[in-house]
Amino acid sequence: DNPSALNLNDDVFFDKKNNVVVSSDTYVEGVHFLNFRKPDLVIKKIVRSSISDLYCKGVKPKFIFIGASGNKKSFSKKNLNLVYKSLNQEQKKYKIKLSGGDTTKSNKTTVTLTSLGYSQKIVQRNKCKNNDDIYVTGNLGDSYLGLLILKKKLFLKKTPQRKYFIQKYYMPDLPTKISTKLIKFANSSIDISDGLFGDLTKLINRSNLYF
């Protein structure tokens, strides 16, 4: 039993004694991203998807650690330079620091990113109350529409709208401003990854409520 693990039912690990908040996510080529043909965009998607776990808890991420595996093609000099450039951009944008990691060989590209921040409090999943209002940030479904376009399951001509949805797939907006206020007014929170209904159900079940 480790109380900091929050019963493995939350987005993060929270060491209340030391004010440490940690989240870890793994992304597999063909499962969590289509391919590694645009490594500069894929790494941005991975960074933002990972640090959003901390933002949704009301915590500002400070450090990230990246473990990656791939083949010679995915780890080519050209791709590594693109990844390096994107990581620098993301570090400046979100004021985070790449602080370690590891690389190894594999057939498919796989990336594990661990995010770390500090906070005396977090917004947990299991604190919902009856009659709580429900809020979301951003436009739900933009990233999914971008995925459908890339998979050629949704056809849009080369318009600003098409470019917009693809951009949201690779570079989702993070609620950095509202995140700092969550601890003051939110009883519960979750980083949406399985759709609004699916993740709302998780919040309700974790809080032993029903609908």
Enumerate the language-model features and the residues they cover.
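Helix-biased detector of long, well-ordered alpha-helical tracts
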Residues: 1-211
